[in-house]
Regions:
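Cap/insert and terminal regions of metallo-dependent hydrolase folds
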Residues: 29-112
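Core dinuclear metal-dependent hydrolase active-site scaffold
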Residues: 1-35, 109-115
Length: 115
């Protein structure tokens, strides 16, 4: 799926054994999970910044924007990635959980996720 990003960027969708994984890659608020797949078991979503920076010149989703889009598309499990270095992963997680309505994880170096 073509990402919402000034530089052409693809967000891959992988389906294995009936389970669907979607990675938004670098993507802005125009990303729509429904364009990637009708049912998503695990989404790894760009969440570079917090909602305080929405609407600015940063071409990436906030934690809240990623969560709202995932919630609206019925994504079963949401993992945030591409956080700005030095930012607080727990602040991103908390903001996303408030919008998503369920648990959200943050991908940190060395993390692995099983679908």
């Amino acid at each position: 799926t073509l990402a919402d990003h000034p530089v052409e960027t693809l967000g891959p969708t992988v389906v294995v054994d009936g389970k669907t994984f979607v990675f938004t890659s670098d993507s802005g608020p125009g990303w729509d999970f429904a364009d990637a797949a009708p049912e998503i078991d695990l989404a790894l979503a760009d969440a570079s910044h917090l909602s305080a920076f929405e609407g600015g010149s940063i071409p990436h989703m906030s934690a809240r924007e990623a969560a709202v889009r995932a919630r609206d598309a019925g994504v079963k499990r949401l993992v945030l990635t591409h956080l700005v270095p030095g930012s607080d992963p727990e602040a991103h997680r908390a903001e996303a959980e408030a919008a998503y309505g369920g648990p959200v994880e943050v991908a940190l170096p060395g993390c692995t996720f099983t679908i």
